[in-house]
């Protein structure tokens, strides 16, 4: 049974890390990040779980003659917000997996 204590210690560390990561995931639900486009004419806000919670469109962004521009602005703001959510998740969870070679983390 050599090395059994080492394995037990490693399992305890993994359980501790799992618990911390679960807590961070819970916090991410509440965190908000925003993406903007068109100089702030469109703002999309998402949670750390990438759930869209708000879309703001300033009046000057609405041109009935150019709906495609508004669509592009909404798309760009959404993509920026999603990228920020990914970065936030990496910051929060990455500190717990640093130095570990876990696929997908």
Swiss-Prot record:
InterPro entries linked to this entry: YbaB-like_sf, YbaB/EbfC
A Pfam family that the UniProt record links to this protein: YbaB_DNA_bd
Keywords, in A-Z order: Cytoplasm, DNA-binding
Compositionally biased tracts (Basic and acidic residues): 21-33
GO annotations of cellular component type: bacterial nucleoid; cytosol
Compositional bias annotation for Low complexity: 7-16
Location of the region described as Disordered in the Swiss-Prot/TrEMBL record: 1-40
Location within or outside the cell: Cytoplasm, Nucleoid
GO molecular function, one term: DNA binding
Top-rank taxon, per record: Bacteria
NCBIfam families (UniProt xref): DNA_YbaB_EbfC (TIGR00103)
Role, per record: Binds to DNA and alters its conformation. May be involved in regulation of gene expression, nucleoid organization and DNA protection.
Family under the similarity heading: Belongs to the YbaB/EbfC family.
Assembly with partners or alone: Homodimer.
Protein's name according to its UniProt entry: Nucleoid-associated protein SERP0115
Organism from which the protein derives: Staphylococcus epidermidis (strain ATCC 35984 / DSM 28319 / BCRC 17069 / CCUG 31568 / BM 3577 / RP62A)
Organism ancestry: Bacteria, Bacillati, Bacillota, Bacilli, Bacillales
């Amino acid at each position: 049974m050599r090395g059994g204590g080492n394995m037990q210690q490693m399992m305890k560390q993994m359980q501790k890390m799992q618990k911390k990561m679960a807590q961070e995931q819970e916090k991410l639900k509440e965190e908000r990040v925003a993406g903007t486009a068109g100089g702030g004419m469109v703002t999309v806000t998402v949670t750390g779980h990438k759930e869209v919670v708000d879309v703001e469109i300033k009046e000057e962004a609405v041109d009935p003659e150019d709906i495609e521009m508004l669509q592009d602005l909404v798309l760009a703001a959404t993509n920026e917000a999603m990228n920020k959510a990914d970065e936030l998740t990496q910051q929060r969870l990455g500190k717990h997996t640093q130095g570990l070679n876990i696929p997908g983390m």
